[in-house]
Swiss-Prot record:
Name by which UniProt lists this protein: Catalase-peroxidase
Cofactor binding: number and manner: Binds 1 heme b (iron(II)-protoporphyrin IX) group per dimer.
PTM section of the record: Formation of the three residue Trp-Tyr-Met cross-link is important for the catalase, but not the peroxidase activity of the enzyme.
Native organism: Salmonella choleraesuis (strain SC-B67)
Keyword Cell inner membrane: no
Amino acid sequence: MSTTDDTHNTLSTGKCPFHQGGHDRSAGAGTASRDWWPNQLRVDLLNQHSNRSNPLGEDFDYRKEFSKLDYSALKGDLKALLTDSQPWWPADWGSYVGLFIRMAWHGAGTYRSIDGRGGAGRGQQRFAPLNSWPDNVSLDKARRLLWPIKQKYGQKISWADLFILAGNVALENSGFRTFGFGAGREDVWEPDLDVNWGDEKAWLTHRHPEALAKAPLGATEMGLIYVNPEGPDHSGEPLSAAAAIRATFGNMGMNDEETVALIAGGHTLGKTHGAAAASHVGADPEAAPIEAQGLGWASSYGSGVGADAITSGLEVVWTQTPTQWSNYFFENLFKYEWVQTRSPAGAIQFEAVDAPDIIPDPFDPSKKRKPTMLVTDLTLRFDPEFEKISRRFLNDPQAFNEAFARAWFKLTHRDMGPKARYIGPEVPKEDLIWQDPLPQPLYQPTQEDIINLKAAIAASGLSISEMVSVAWASASTFRGGDKRGGANGARLALAPQRDWEVNAVAARVLPVLEALQKTTNKASLADIIVLAGVVGIEQAAAAAGVSISVPFAPGRVDARQDQTDIEMFSLLEPIADGFRNYRARLDVSTTESLLIDKAQQLTLTAPEMTVLVGGMRVLGTNFDGSQNGVFTDRPGVLSTDFFANLLDMRYEWKPTDESNELFEGRDRLTGEVKYTATRADLVFGSNSVLRALAEVYACSDAHEKFVKDFVAAWVKVMNLDRFDLQ
């Protein structure tokens, strides 16, 4: 019988053919565009974390809410929670100290300095994939233990801040003196889509350290925070783990001393859990049944909790006082001889063969066991460089305490950006180089000063292209992930930024602006650089027949070279900046994907990216002065010509060579080459979503809207690092 007959029979009996079971017809189900075209451009990355997903609304002010928080009472509640053991997840030795330290560590430990993504700044541990990573087993329980406290204090404390504060309080409760705590992490309400966790399709796929150097991700295996605790690819070899440890900790900006301090400090308290084989462990939170209510890894072994708990599969307790701070980690590491053994779950670990039974059992006070260590713990003894640091910490516990306090603070605050973003009563006074410190303001330019400065810039002989280009070069280093970079500080005038190929315009323009700054002495160089962009855009808009005042907020300062970590700032150098038609390497993704990546780092929406590219092309801001994408006969005029000519069917585009990176636009009738373009230009005509946006600005009635939209997006970029205005 035909499908038509089936449908007819269904209708004749009064039944709806769409309610008869079979295929999933719910929203979002079925074969999607990316199933057909897996390399489809991810324009959707520019739409994440919008107000549509935020239940608190766009008027919510976290800093204002936090100011209402009884901070002391909150810390008191956290301290009480540490020893309030719950039967559904009993605390080891009656304390959740180790669990909460691990929760905070694993929240912050996803940060990587190469692109500033990951980290604890958004509370992403609540969402997939992190909530279900193999390395985060049982942290769902830690978050549930915190829920009554989050419920009590509501929006006065974000989940993101609470996770880290809980780790700090756990350390303090163990007798350790922390370096401080800065709040200010605002929650988001959906998973980050922009973080590249790697290409692997299976959990715990091994990555060689050399591969990590080429693609500096945060871990040596998919689903781990750092390294495999059993050694690379379960090798069980402490020495072979050294390269992996350096690679992963180095990728988040940690040196050898910080690395040793963090590993030892983190393993001074608590334990690992491996009561039985992983086959007893159920589905992770994302795959668990609906009745599990977001909890995962249910264990069928014994009670499944307490002494029967299975987390990593390792069963290690490092110190004699696992709920109190000590130097026992280093004492045990060097005092005893270690032999390889296996946990009850079969995982490779080491036991102190010549040690007495001095380690307390977490649930039976009458029992003791020998000290145990992870494979990667022993790396700190057998790697020559790590060993020197470890012995120093063994002999100088105060040096260890100081190193761990600072390294822990760095670990948990590295992705927060400048100190200006920190709030709360425990923010340390000391400025740290990794915070990209800035001096106090020297200038407070008046409105009259600004008017005079604009006139001086306009009379300086700089072109519109030069003025706009230098402002973009200064501001566009900003990264939304870790809030680094931006125009404040005028680091464009310092090493390493002044020497970047993409910033070639700085060599021509900065001497002019620096001379002007010294002559007038009314504003910082940082403000003058941004003001130059204002002058250039206002001139370009006027040339297009639109009178507009570009908003400008003074108050930027000029950083010193000694306040600038050259190595860390080198990571901000773009491998591509499609807004300036710049690309340094052809072996990393596609040009158009890198444009999306750059726009996402600048927190731009797809319309904002579109209008900025179109405007910057007609203003002639290509890094090398090329004519690629300059689809206009009147450069320097803020017109919609880029869009109108890109979408004009009079022109046919063809690649100039097999690389498919450069293209010529020829007149279909004459064959004459009219324009040249890169992939960062043509994508606005080829991608269906971006073409739809380009069509808006190509319409005959779009000119004034285009100028206003361009100015709004431009000002947004210029002020991305103005946390004093937010």
